[in-house]
Amino acid sequence: MEDVVLKLEGVSKSFAKVEKDEITHALGNIDLEMHSGEFISLVGTSGCGKSTILRLIAGLITPTVGRLTVNDKEITGPDPERGMVFQRPTLFPWLTVEKNIGFSLKMKNHLKGNEDKVDRMLRLIGLEDFKDDYPGQLSGGMAQRVALVRSLINEPPILLLDEPRGALDAFTRMNMQDEILSAWRERRQLAIMVTHDVDEAIYMGTRVIVMEANPGRIKADIPIHLDYPRNRSSAQFVEYRNQILGMLNYGAAE
């Protein structure tokens, strides 16, 4: 097992609703360790705190109680070491595909001499022929692929994926799953993904963390002992699916 990269210690998060004079307890006393090279899938019903955990790790919000650390350094805000891909692609509409991908390198004055890295990312997602197009000319799936590699180009040690395939059709989702896995397996950084799709969680994850609500907490932490690429129809895959669906009270698939 690789060294611990990310640690959550006694993390709770509450949100105040001033207009209703009430407090929502989104997370309660979360303890969790994640290692370099892991692909963590967070699953659970709506309101169980999956996305709250991701936003805490990204540094977009702070815990009410507890602490989060990366390599023993406390998270106090956003950091390029933690790249995030949102559910809907956030691209600059006035920049071409090529310039969107290279934007962060340009901001760091690292673009010169790294043009080959941008070209490699374009090849990775199969959009070499669309590099001069603008986001408004792309399909939803193409735009999401651009958003993905824009986060990958800096090779962040931690990659955060907030249902980055949620708005895509089923066929495009499966292609995106394979593209994300290909990029992750090439770099073997820590990847953490929020999803409502149990099959997706098993197909991609080295661990599946099952959460429950009121307040959000970890119900189970399940290592997935399947080689890549994975077969959704295999007996072991179906066994994992039934186990997790049972924990989520959806019942096992027949």
Predicted regions and their residues:
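Short helical segment in ABC ATPase nucleotide-binding domains corresponding to the A-loop/adjacent helical element
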Residues: 98-107, 115, 119, 223
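Helix-to-loop junction immediately C-terminal to a conserved catalytic motif
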Residues: 58
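Conserved ABC transporter NBD signature motif
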Residues: 66-78
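The feature captures the beta-strand-to-loop junction immediately N-terminal to the Walker
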Residues: 43-45
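Conserved signature/switch motifs of ABC ATPase nucleotide-binding domains
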Residues: 133-136, 154
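Conserved ABC ATPase "signature" region
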Residues: 112-130, 182
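Hydrophobic anchor residue at the start of the ABC signature
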Residues: 148
